[in-house]
Amino acid sequence: MTPAEFQALTGATSQQITDLETFIERLAEANAVMNLIGPDTLPDVWNRHIWDSTQLLALAPDARTWADLGAGAGFPGVVLAILLKGVPDAHVWLIDSLGKRCRFLQAVVDELGLPATVVNGRAEEQMIRVDVVTARAVAAMDKLLGYAQPYLQRGAQGLFLKGEKVEAELIEARNVWQFDSDLSVSRSDPRGRIVSVRSLRRVHSR
């Protein structure tokens, strides 16, 4: 996928494309000195990472506030912040426990003037009320729901980008958690799935 193809697919503005291109440049620079994404995925960054992140917006079109847990390389959180820039009351919290990743994220947020706050800390310890909590490539569903619990119990919808083994992960997670969920096929990779979660509560402790 090229920037022009992404723009035709999504209706992104020229400024949004410019911001996304700047983000990709900064990501490539940072990736040379720290492991943010697999270097072999950079040539397909527009489909593999940008479009993969963007598709979440269609699943929560009215959402204005998002929390990205384990924000790492900025997927999906930075992409969402770029696309939501200028939308009234929009804000994205980028939460990561590793300081060097947070410094990278903060530099991008500052350069692009994004409606985002970088939080260096553990996801499950933050008391933030948002419309949607999301994560990508962070943990299996049983652990991920533990990280997301404070947000889900404050009314957030969970939208989690997962791989083709997610159904087995959901079976395992139901040994620990009770929740309502729906699966959508990823629009960037038919093997991927997006898990929508609501109404989480723990059924017993491990």
Predicted regions and their residues:
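Class I SAM-dependent transferase core
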Residues: 1-67, 99-114
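Residue-level signal for inorganic ion chemistry
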Residues: 27, 162, 197
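Conserved hydrophobic residues forming the short capping helix/wall of the S-adenosyl-L-methionine
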Residues: 31, 84, 109, 174-177
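Conserved SAM/SAH cofactor-binding pocket of Class I
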Residues: 54-135, 145
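Conserved beta-strand segments of alpha/beta enzyme cores
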Residues: 91, 115-117, 157, 178-182
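Short strand-turn motif at the edge of the Rossmann-like AdoMet-binding core
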Residues: 97, 138, 161-165
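A short glycine-rich, Lys/Arg-flanked "PGG" loop and its adjoining helix->strand segment in the class I
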Residues: 145-158
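Active-site capping/gating segments
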Residues: 165-206
